[in-house]
Protein backbone atom coordinates (compact mmCIF):
# COMPACT_ATOMS: atom_id res chain seq x y z
CA UNK A 1 0.00 0.00 0.00
CA UNK A 2 1.23 3.49 -0.81
CA UNK A 3 0.25 4.71 2.66
CA UNK A 4 2.51 2.11 4.29
CA UNK A 5 5.70 3.14 2.47
CA UNK A 6 8.46 4.83 4.44
CA UNK A 7 9.15 7.42 1.75
CA UNK A 8 12.80 6.53 1.17
CA UNK A 9 12.21 7.16 -2.55
CA UNK A 10 12.01 10.87 -1.76
CA UNK A 11 15.81 10.81 -1.70
CA UNK A 12 15.79 9.55 -5.29
CA UNK A 13 13.76 12.59 -6.32
CA UNK A 14 16.05 14.98 -4.44
CA UNK A 15 19.15 13.34 -5.94
CA UNK A 16 17.82 13.49 -9.51
CA UNK A 17 16.74 17.08 -8.94
CA UNK A 18 20.30 18.00 -8.04
CA UNK A 19 21.73 16.10 -11.03
CA UNK A 20 19.35 17.89 -13.39
CA UNK A 21 20.11 21.26 -11.77
CA UNK A 22 23.72 21.03 -13.00
CA UNK A 23 23.74 21.84 -16.71
CA UNK A 24 26.32 19.31 -17.95
CA UNK A 25 25.13 16.44 -15.76
CA UNK A 26 21.48 17.24 -16.40
CA UNK A 27 21.89 17.37 -20.18
CA UNK A 28 23.76 14.08 -20.08
CA UNK A 29 20.86 12.50 -18.20
CA UNK A 30 18.36 13.95 -20.67
CA UNK A 31 20.36 12.48 -23.54
CA UNK A 32 20.60 9.09 -21.85
CA UNK A 33 16.85 8.96 -21.33
CA UNK A 34 16.26 9.73 -25.02
CA UNK A 35 18.38 6.81 -26.23
CA UNK A 36 16.43 3.93 -27.80
CA UNK A 37 15.70 0.99 -25.57
CA UNK A 38 17.89 -2.08 -26.32
CA UNK A 39 14.71 -4.10 -26.86
CA UNK A 40 13.64 -1.70 -29.61
CA UNK A 41 16.96 -2.09 -31.41
CA UNK A 42 16.71 -5.87 -31.10
CA UNK A 43 13.16 -6.07 -32.43
CA UNK A 44 13.34 -3.34 -35.05
CA UNK A 45 14.22 -5.82 -37.78
CA UNK A 46 11.26 -7.98 -36.78
CA UNK A 47 8.89 -5.04 -37.18
CA UNK A 48 10.47 -4.05 -40.48
CA UNK A 49 9.80 -7.56 -41.73
CA UNK A 50 6.39 -8.30 -40.21
CA UNK A 51 4.85 -4.83 -39.84
CA UNK A 52 3.31 -5.69 -36.46
CA UNK A 53 4.39 -6.57 -32.92
CA UNK A 54 2.04 -7.12 -29.98
CA UNK A 55 3.80 -6.62 -26.66
CA UNK A 56 0.60 -7.11 -24.66
CA UNK A 57 0.31 -3.78 -22.81
CA UNK A 58 1.18 -2.00 -26.06
CA UNK A 59 1.31 -2.89 -29.72
CA UNK A 60 2.65 -1.41 -32.93
CA UNK A 61 1.36 -1.88 -36.45
CA UNK A 62 2.39 -0.35 -39.75
CA UNK A 63 -0.59 1.03 -41.63
CA UNK A 64 0.52 2.43 -44.96
CA UNK A 65 3.08 5.13 -44.25
CA UNK A 66 2.22 5.28 -40.54
CA UNK A 67 3.54 3.33 -37.57
CA UNK A 68 0.58 3.10 -35.19
CA UNK A 69 1.31 2.64 -31.48
CA UNK A 70 -1.64 1.57 -29.32
CA UNK A 71 -1.80 1.37 -25.53
CA UNK A 72 -3.66 -1.81 -24.50
CA UNK A 73 -4.81 -1.94 -20.89
CA UNK A 74 -8.48 -2.84 -21.47
CA UNK A 75 -9.50 -3.58 -17.88
CA UNK A 76 -8.36 -0.13 -16.72
CA UNK A 77 -9.58 1.94 -19.69
CA UNK A 78 -6.05 2.08 -21.09
CA UNK A 79 -4.65 3.64 -17.94
CA UNK A 80 -0.87 3.72 -17.58
CA UNK A 81 1.03 1.86 -14.89
CA UNK A 82 4.26 0.00 -14.28
CA UNK A 83 3.05 -2.82 -16.54
CA UNK A 84 2.47 -0.60 -19.59
CA UNK A 85 5.34 1.90 -19.47
CA UNK A 86 8.25 -0.16 -20.80
CA UNK A 87 6.33 -1.69 -23.69
CA UNK A 88 4.85 1.65 -24.72
CA UNK A 89 8.32 3.19 -24.82
CA UNK A 90 9.76 0.26 -26.79
CA UNK A 91 6.90 0.50 -29.29
CA UNK A 92 7.46 4.26 -29.63
CA UNK A 93 11.18 3.72 -30.23
CA UNK A 94 10.46 1.18 -32.95
CA UNK A 95 7.94 3.52 -34.58
CA UNK A 96 10.36 6.44 -34.63
CA UNK A 97 13.26 4.36 -35.96
CA UNK A 98 11.24 2.34 -38.49
CA UNK A 99 12.65 3.14 -41.97
CA UNK A 100 9.49 1.94 -43.73
CA UNK A 101 7.17 4.55 -42.16
CA UNK A 102 7.14 8.33 -42.30
CA UNK A 103 4.84 9.28 -39.45
CA UNK A 104 3.71 7.91 -36.07
CA UNK A 105 0.20 7.62 -34.65
CA UNK A 106 -0.74 7.17 -30.98
CA UNK A 107 -4.04 5.46 -30.12
CA UNK A 108 -5.79 3.75 -27.26
CA UNK A 109 -7.08 0.25 -28.01
CA UNK A 110 -10.49 -1.33 -27.34
CA UNK A 111 -11.49 -1.61 -23.67
CA UNK A 112 -13.50 -4.08 -21.58
CA UNK A 113 -15.77 -1.73 -19.63
CA UNK A 114 -19.44 -2.38 -20.55
CA UNK A 115 -20.11 1.36 -20.83
CA UNK A 116 -17.60 1.56 -23.69
CA UNK A 117 -18.14 -1.89 -25.20
CA UNK A 118 -16.76 -2.11 -28.73
CA UNK A 119 -15.06 1.28 -28.46
CA UNK A 120 -11.51 2.49 -28.36
CA UNK A 121 -10.56 4.79 -25.48
CA UNK A 122 -7.48 6.98 -25.67
CA UNK A 123 -6.31 7.01 -22.05
CA UNK A 124 -7.58 7.12 -18.48
CA UNK A 125 -4.22 8.47 -17.29
CA UNK A 126 -2.28 6.98 -14.40
CA UNK A 127 -3.76 3.80 -12.92
CA UNK A 128 -5.06 5.24 -9.66
CA UNK A 129 -5.85 1.83 -8.21
CA UNK A 130 -2.24 0.78 -8.71
CA UNK A 131 -1.08 4.12 -7.31
CA UNK A 132 -3.13 3.67 -4.14
CA UNK A 133 -1.94 0.08 -3.76
CA UNK A 134 1.71 1.15 -3.90
CA UNK A 135 2.37 -0.32 -7.35
CA UNK A 136 3.62 2.95 -8.91
CA UNK A 137 7.20 3.82 -7.86
CA UNK A 138 8.41 7.41 -7.87
CA UNK A 139 10.80 6.72 -10.74
CA UNK A 140 7.82 5.73 -12.90
CA UNK A 141 6.86 9.38 -13.34
CA UNK A 142 10.40 10.47 -14.16
CA UNK A 143 11.11 7.59 -16.55
CA UNK A 144 7.85 8.30 -18.35
CA UNK A 145 8.33 12.05 -18.81
CA UNK A 146 12.03 11.90 -19.64
CA UNK A 147 11.52 8.76 -21.72
CA UNK A 148 8.52 7.92 -23.88
CA UNK A 149 6.73 11.29 -23.71
CA UNK A 150 9.90 13.25 -24.40
CA UNK A 151 10.81 10.89 -27.25
CA UNK A 152 7.50 11.63 -28.92
CA UNK A 153 8.14 15.34 -28.42
CA UNK A 154 11.86 15.39 -29.33
CA UNK A 155 12.74 12.12 -31.05
CA UNK A 156 15.28 9.44 -30.24
CA UNK A 157 18.85 10.43 -29.42
CA UNK A 158 22.09 8.82 -30.53
CA UNK A 159 25.02 8.09 -28.27
CA UNK A 160 27.46 10.42 -30.02
CA UNK A 161 25.32 13.51 -30.79
CA UNK A 162 23.64 15.87 -28.35
CA UNK A 163 19.84 15.93 -28.65
CA UNK A 164 19.94 19.68 -28.03
CA UNK A 165 18.20 21.65 -30.78
CA UNK A 166 21.09 24.09 -31.20
CA UNK A 167 24.13 21.84 -30.97
CA UNK A 168 22.84 18.50 -32.20
CA UNK A 169 19.59 16.75 -32.97
CA UNK A 170 17.63 13.52 -32.82
CA UNK A 171 16.01 11.02 -35.14
CA UNK A 172 12.37 12.07 -35.12
CA UNK A 173 9.04 11.86 -36.92
CA UNK A 174 5.77 13.76 -36.63
CA UNK A 175 3.21 12.29 -34.22
CA UNK A 176 -0.58 12.24 -34.63
CA UNK A 177 -2.94 11.33 -31.78
CA UNK A 178 -6.35 9.76 -32.28
CA UNK A 179 -8.42 10.83 -29.26
CA UNK A 180 -11.34 8.45 -28.74
CA UNK A 181 -13.53 8.94 -25.67
CA UNK A 182 -11.31 10.84 -23.30
CA UNK A 183 -7.75 11.81 -22.46
CA UNK A 184 -7.46 12.02 -18.69
CA UNK A 185 -4.29 13.09 -16.88
CA UNK A 186 -1.36 11.43 -18.59
CA UNK A 187 -3.48 10.95 -21.70
CA UNK A 188 -3.85 14.72 -21.99
CA UNK A 189 -0.11 15.08 -21.35
CA UNK A 190 0.56 12.99 -24.45
CA UNK A 191 -1.57 15.34 -26.54
CA UNK A 192 0.67 18.27 -25.61
CA UNK A 193 3.61 16.41 -27.20
CA UNK A 194 1.79 15.69 -30.47
CA UNK A 195 2.04 17.50 -33.79
CA UNK A 196 -1.62 16.93 -34.69
CA UNK A 197 -4.65 15.70 -32.74
CA UNK A 198 -7.80 14.18 -34.22
CA UNK A 199 -10.62 13.90 -31.66
CA UNK A 200 -14.12 12.53 -31.62
CA UNK A 201 -16.83 15.13 -31.14
CA UNK A 202 -17.87 13.43 -27.88
CA UNK A 203 -14.34 13.34 -26.44
CA UNK A 204 -13.00 15.39 -23.56
CA UNK A 205 -9.74 16.12 -21.73
CA UNK A 206 -8.94 16.60 -18.06
CA UNK A 207 -5.84 17.06 -15.92
CA UNK A 208 -7.21 16.16 -12.47
CA UNK A 209 -3.97 16.82 -10.60
CA UNK A 210 -5.83 18.41 -7.68
CA UNK A 211 -7.93 15.29 -7.13
CA UNK A 212 -4.91 13.01 -7.53
CA UNK A 213 -2.48 15.04 -5.46
CA UNK A 214 0.40 14.94 -7.96
CA UNK A 215 2.03 17.11 -10.63
CA UNK A 216 0.71 16.22 -14.11
CA UNK A 217 4.02 15.48 -15.80
CA UNK A 218 5.22 18.25 -18.09
CA UNK A 219 1.73 19.73 -18.47
CA UNK A 220 2.68 22.68 -16.24
CA UNK A 221 5.44 23.43 -18.74
CA UNK A 222 3.41 22.91 -21.93
CA UNK A 223 -0.26 23.58 -21.36
CA UNK A 224 0.09 27.37 -21.15
CA UNK A 225 1.33 27.39 -24.76
CA UNK A 226 -2.05 26.06 -25.85
CA UNK A 227 -4.51 27.63 -23.42
CA UNK A 228 -2.75 30.52 -21.70
CA UNK A 229 -1.83 30.71 -18.04
CA UNK A 230 -5.32 31.28 -16.61
CA UNK A 231 -7.13 28.36 -18.26
CA UNK A 232 -4.09 26.12 -17.69
CA UNK A 233 -4.32 26.84 -13.96
CA UNK A 234 -8.05 26.17 -14.02
CA UNK A 235 -7.44 22.81 -15.68
CA UNK A 236 -4.55 21.70 -13.44
CA UNK A 237 -5.44 23.25 -10.10
CA UNK A 238 -9.24 23.28 -10.27
CA UNK A 239 -9.96 20.24 -12.44
CA UNK A 240 -11.66 22.10 -15.29
CA UNK A 241 -12.93 19.67 -17.91
CA UNK A 242 -12.16 20.60 -21.51
CA UNK A 243 -14.58 19.36 -24.14
CA UNK A 244 -12.67 18.71 -27.34
CA UNK A 245 -15.44 20.36 -29.36
CA UNK A 246 -15.17 23.69 -27.54
CA UNK A 247 -13.14 26.86 -28.14
CA UNK A 248 -10.57 25.77 -25.52
CA UNK A 249 -10.56 22.16 -26.68
CA UNK A 250 -9.90 23.18 -30.26
CA UNK A 251 -6.72 24.91 -29.13
CA UNK A 252 -5.35 21.44 -28.35
CA UNK A 253 -7.30 19.34 -30.87
CA UNK A 254 -6.77 20.17 -34.53
CA UNK A 255 -9.70 18.30 -36.04
CA UNK A 256 -13.04 17.27 -34.50
CA UNK A 257 -15.03 14.55 -36.24
CA UNK A 258 -17.93 12.22 -35.53
CA UNK A 259 -16.77 9.27 -33.40
CA UNK A 260 -17.55 6.77 -36.16
CA UNK A 261 -15.33 8.71 -38.58
CA UNK A 262 -12.13 8.49 -36.53
CA UNK A 263 -10.46 5.66 -38.47
CA UNK A 264 -11.20 7.19 -41.85
CA UNK A 265 -10.13 10.66 -40.75
CA UNK A 266 -6.85 9.55 -39.19
CA UNK A 267 -5.98 7.69 -42.39
CA UNK A 268 -6.73 10.86 -44.37
CA UNK A 269 -4.60 13.01 -42.06
CA UNK A 270 -1.71 10.56 -42.46
CA UNK A 271 -2.14 10.80 -46.22
CA UNK A 272 -2.19 14.61 -46.08
CA UNK A 273 0.99 14.66 -43.98
CA UNK A 274 2.90 12.23 -46.19
CA UNK A 275 1.60 12.85 -49.72
CA UNK A 276 4.36 15.36 -50.41
CA UNK A 277 6.90 13.67 -48.15
CA UNK A 278 7.90 14.67 -44.64
CA UNK A 279 11.44 15.83 -45.40
CA UNK A 280 11.03 19.11 -43.51
CA UNK A 281 8.98 17.71 -40.62
CA UNK A 282 11.92 17.09 -38.28
CA UNK A 283 13.43 20.48 -39.10
CA UNK A 284 10.18 22.29 -38.39
CA UNK A 285 9.72 20.39 -35.13
CA UNK A 286 13.22 21.42 -34.02
CA UNK A 287 12.56 25.02 -35.01
CA UNK A 288 9.38 25.12 -32.92
CA UNK A 289 11.16 23.57 -29.93
CA UNK A 290 14.12 25.94 -30.17
CA UNK A 291 11.72 28.76 -29.33
CA UNK A 292 9.00 27.05 -27.29
CA UNK A 293 10.87 24.46 -25.23
CA UNK A 294 14.59 23.90 -25.86
CA UNK A 295 16.07 20.89 -24.12
CA UNK A 296 17.74 23.04 -21.47
CA UNK A 297 14.36 24.49 -20.49
CA UNK A 298 13.02 20.96 -20.10
CA UNK A 299 16.06 20.05 -17.99
CA UNK A 300 15.42 22.94 -15.62
CA UNK A 301 11.74 22.07 -15.36
CA UNK A 302 12.52 18.44 -14.57
CA UNK A 303 14.94 19.52 -11.83
CA UNK A 304 11.99 21.08 -10.03
CA UNK A 305 9.59 18.32 -11.02
CA UNK A 306 11.69 15.47 -9.60
CA UNK A 307 11.89 17.10 -6.19
CA UNK A 308 8.31 18.31 -5.93
CA UNK A 309 6.77 15.12 -7.33
CA UNK A 310 8.69 13.14 -4.71
CA UNK A 311 7.06 15.15 -1.95
CA UNK A 312 3.62 14.83 -3.57
CA UNK A 313 3.98 11.08 -4.14
CA UNK A 314 4.48 10.43 -0.44
CA UNK A 315 2.11 13.06 0.92
CA UNK A 316 -0.79 11.95 3.15
CA UNK A 317 -2.92 14.23 0.97
CA UNK A 318 -2.42 11.88 -1.98
CA UNK A 319 -3.94 8.98 -0.06
CA UNK A 320 -6.79 11.14 1.22
CA UNK A 321 -7.54 12.43 -2.28
CA UNK A 322 -7.60 8.94 -3.79
CA UNK A 323 -9.96 7.72 -1.09
CA UNK A 324 -12.20 10.77 -1.36
CA UNK A 325 -12.40 11.17 -5.14
CA UNK A 326 -11.65 7.65 -6.40
CA UNK A 327 -13.02 5.40 -3.64
CA UNK A 328 -9.62 3.75 -3.92
CA UNK A 329 -9.86 1.73 -0.72
CA UNK A 330 -12.74 -0.30 -2.20
CA UNK A 331 -11.17 -0.99 -5.59
CA UNK A 332 -9.24 -4.15 -6.35
CA UNK A 333 -6.21 -4.67 -8.57
Whereabouts are the PLM-identified features?
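Extended acidic/polar regulatory tracts at the flanks of large eukaryotic scaffold/adaptor proteins
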Residues: 76-77
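Active-site donor-nucleotide binding/catalytic segment of nucleotide-sugar enzymes
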Residues: 73
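Crotonase-fold acyl-CoA enzyme core
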Residues: 164-278
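Hydrophobic/aromatic residues within transmembrane alpha-helices
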Residues: 69, 106, 127, 190-191, ...
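A structural preference for short, pocket-lining loop segments at secondary-structure junctions
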Residues: 64, 69-70, 87-171, 176, ...
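C-terminal alpha-helix plus adjacent terminal tail
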Residues: 1-64, 111, 243, 264, ...
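Phosphate/oxyanion-binding active-site loops and adjacent basic polyanion-contact surfaces
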Residues: 80-85
Amino acid sequence: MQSEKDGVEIDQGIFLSQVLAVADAGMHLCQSMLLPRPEAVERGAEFLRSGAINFGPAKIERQGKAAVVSVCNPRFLNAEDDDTLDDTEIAADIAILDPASEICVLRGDFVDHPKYKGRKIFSAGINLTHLYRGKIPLLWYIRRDMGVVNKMFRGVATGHTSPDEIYGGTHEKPWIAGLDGFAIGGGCQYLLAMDYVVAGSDAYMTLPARKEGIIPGAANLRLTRFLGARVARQAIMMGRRLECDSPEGRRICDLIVAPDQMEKTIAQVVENFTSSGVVSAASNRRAFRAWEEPLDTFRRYMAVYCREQAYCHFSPALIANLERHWNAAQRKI
